């Protein structure tokens, strides 16, 4: 795979070896480096992957015709109801049911939701394709 990415060749190598089940110690021996260095390479690769995902989510959110602000004190049920209502107004079919929406929102905004109640504000967008984008940078 020779496509351009935000990963260095070394990061790609380490991730490929980890995916094959290799321990950091075994990778370090193979690459003639320390386990600590392998750990640092893997950690930086995961940070780059997360930044790439966040960038893609940001770009998708720019194209989201539906955006709702989830405010402190809102319940997950209220958020889902508003999200579905606003999507319906725009003629957009959300590709998930309410249970899956609750799971996805809680997963993406886990540190902002406690016991199904929003503790700090964030936004959710819905793309024309019905995909949900949770924007924690709002």
Curated annotation (Swiss-Prot):
This is DNA-binding protein Tfx. Belongs to the Tfx family. Keywords: Activator, DNA-binding, Transcription, Transcription regulation. InterPro entries: RNA_pol_sigma70_r4, Tfx_C, Tfx_DNA-bd_arc, Tfx_DNA-bd_euryarc, Tfx_DNA-bd_sf_arc. It holds the Pfam family Sigma70_r4. Transcriptional activator of the fmdECB operon. One of its GO terms (molecular function) is DNA-binding transcription factor activity. The gene is tfx. The keyword Transcription regulation applies. HAMAP family: HTH_type_Tfx (MF_00620). It comes from the Archaea. It comes from Methanothermobacter thermautotrophicus (strain ATCC 29096 / DSM 1053 / JCM 10044 / NBRC 100330 / Delta H) (Methanobacterium thermoautotrophicum). GO terms for biological process: DNA-templated transcription initiation. The keyword Oxidoreductase does not apply.
């Amino acid at each position: 795979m020779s496509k351009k990415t935000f990963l260095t060749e070394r990061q790609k190598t380490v991730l490929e070896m980890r995916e094959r089940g290799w321990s950091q110690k075994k990778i370090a021996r193979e690459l003639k480096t320390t386990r600590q260095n392998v750990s640092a390479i893997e950690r930086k690769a995961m940070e780059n992957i997360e930044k790439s995902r966040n960038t893609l989510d940001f770009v998708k959110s720019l194209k989201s015709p539906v955006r709702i602000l989830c405010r402190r004190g809102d319940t997950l049920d209220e958020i889902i109801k508003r999200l579905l209502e606003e999507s319906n107004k725009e003629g957009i079919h959300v590709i998930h049911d309410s249970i899956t929406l609750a799971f996805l929102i809680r997963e993406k905004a886990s540190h902002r939701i406690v016991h199904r109640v929003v503790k700090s504000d964030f936004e959710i967008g819905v793309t024309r394709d019905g995909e949900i984008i949770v924007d924690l940078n709002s």
